[in-house]
Amino acid sequence: LNLPVPAEFCGRFDTVFEAGTLQHVFDLPQVFANLHALVQEGGRVIHGMAPSTNHVDHGFYMFSPTLFHDFYTANGWRIEAEYFFEFFPFWFRGRFHSTPWKIRRYTPGCLDALAYGGFGARQVALFVVATKVPGATADRIPQQSYFSRFHQAQQRKRGTVPIFSDPVAPVAAVEKMGTVPLFLLKLKEWKQRLKRLLPRRLP
């Protein structure tokens, strides 16, 4: 998977299910290019068990959900589902055992309060489904949506901002401009500051 897939496999599949392989392959851009090549238009890529928090040395990488959201959004795919789930491993303290998994829907920014040490001992993994729609690509480099939100917040402080429905919006959305009253921006800013003082909890 570090190399391009053979041409005879390109566009042959309506679904590619990736269940914990991504983290073991060094060249991630090539893997995403391969997924794009394998799936026919209208087909789906499913990431079924992408390791996130507390998977040290399991593979080359642990993934933030923003990777999948930002990559597929930037490349014009339609994201059907994004979830993150907490779990203890099946083999736990010498016993084959698993407590119920806590599964939550992911939206950009929902984990900001937990970004640094907020999950404790819990393991977290990801589930993502993306559809290859007409015009979708795999070669656009995404801007991390965290910094897109930060940049938009700075623009709001100046008074006039683009109104996007998504932190990583298509270029065409720039045409949809709007202004936000300054007092509403300040109110939102203070609400965010107060929220940081509250105990951390999952959405």
What is the predicted role of each segment?
Residues L1-D57, T66:
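Conserved SAM-binding loop
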Residues M49-P51, E86, P134:
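Short beta-strand segments enriched in hydrophobic/aromatic residues
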Residues L3, F84-P89:
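Residue-level detector of flexible, active-site-proximal loop/helix-junction positions
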Residues P89-V168:
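Flexible, glycine-/basic-rich loop-and-beta segments that form/coincide
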Residues Q152-P203:
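Membrane-proximal basic amphipathic "stem/tether" segments
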Residues H58-F85, R93-I103:
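Conserved Class I S-adenosyl-L-methionine
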